A protein has these predicted regions:
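Acidic/histidine-rich catalytic neighborhood
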Residues: 178, 182-183, 189-229
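Structural recognition of the beta-strand scaffold that forms the well-ordered cores
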Residues: 12-15, 28-30, 75-76, 83-88, ...
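Loop/turn elements at helix/coil->beta-strand transitions in domains of secreted/extracellular proteins
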Residues: 8-10, 79-85, 129-135, 179-184, ...
Length: 306
């Protein structure tokens, strides 16, 4: 299905914003802003202004004033007198600056992908005067399967084939829309996926002076807040260890467009080599995931379709 779309239109291999993770990337697509500027600097982060960790998966956190910055495209459309229908797109289920799309659907894993396709088909096959000008929808697959089984697993291939069949159904049915010839379709992703293994694991706790560590924000990238006088020493240790890159947040390479948010980034940012897992624990823990993202966005494993 994607091949036929590419032949009918255009396509490109693109790389995501950094960090190459779900919510930062989706909200970047919605706002046109890098995560440093739209505020969702990772799926989970520590906000020094509030004084605690926040998560995009926490229903109360995402409703905090100022959690989301920037203006998502559905609010821009509505301000211009257009109608937006947004189905499960990250960030759409909460008011941002007091505004939301005309129609929005909170995330739920219960509706099948064919049912989700039907939501869009129904919206676009109404009488022309009732058709929304902007529709956005989100699938969590094959991402979820790739996390569990790995990007090259038979399960991931089967899930990708299932999504392809849903898209084939969607593009067949959407031709009934009275405005079909005027619709611009974009099919894209939020990031790529890299394979993980238990052997590619580094526990940072034994490497660092734990009395100098204030907090950690696990994930990819790995957030490390240390006492200021220990920062340079910690960075030297991490770089010497290998399989990772570490910077003070204000010294991140410019190409990442990352490191300037005033309250939501630790003073050291650590990006593991693609395929490696970083941890901070009293005991070594088994890497159970078989795939993840968040690595250097220029790495081809992080690239995505457009």
């Amino acid at each position: 299905t994607l091949d036929s779309l590419a032949r009918a239109g255009t396509y490109a291999e693109i790389y995501p914003v950094y960090p190459s993770n779900t919510f930062p990337s989706h909200y970047a697509m919605a706002t046109g802003l890098h995560p440093d500027h739209h505020g969702v600097v990772n799926n989970n982060f520590y906000d020094r202004k509030i004084g605690r960790k926040l998560s995009v998966f926490d229903a109360e956190d995402v409703r905090l004033p100022g959690f989301w910055s920037g203006e998502p495209i559905w609010n821009t459309a509505e301000r211009q007198g257009l109608t937006a229908n947004i189905f499960m797109w990250p960030g759409s289920e909460v008011p941002i600056d007091g505004h939301q799309a005309t129609v929005w659907t909170p995330y739920s894993s219960k509706p099948t992908y064919y049912q989700r396709a039907d939501w869009v088909i129904e919206a676009m096959t109404r009488p022309e005067a009732e058709i929304p000008e902007l529709v956005m929808w989100y699938f969590e697959e094959p991402d979820a399967t790739m996390h569990t089984y790995g990007p090259d697993s038979p399960q991931a291939v089967a899930q990708a084939e299932h999504i392809d069949s849903v898209l084939r159904y969607f593009f067949r049915e959407i031709r009934r829309s009275p405005v079909f010839e005027r619709i611009n379709f974009i099919v894209t992703a939020d990031h790529g996926m890299a394979a993980l293994s238990p052997e590619r694991y580094i526990n940072l706790m034994p490497l660092l002076d734990t009395t100098q560590v204030i907090r950690t924000v696990p994930g990819t990238p790995f957030g490390l807040e240390v006492k200021e006088e220990y920062a340079d020493t910690a960075i030297r240790i991490l770089r010497r260890t290998g399989h990772m890159k570490a910077w003070r947040r204000e010294q991140m390479p410019r190409r990442f467009h990352y490191g300037t948010h005033p309250t939501r980034l630790t003073n050291i940012i650590v990006i593991p080599e693609t395929g490696w897992t970083l941890d901070y624990a009293a005991e070594t823990r088994l890497v159970r995931k078989r795939g993840t993202h968040g690595f250097d966005n220029r790495d081809r494993d992080m690239h995505m379709v457009f």
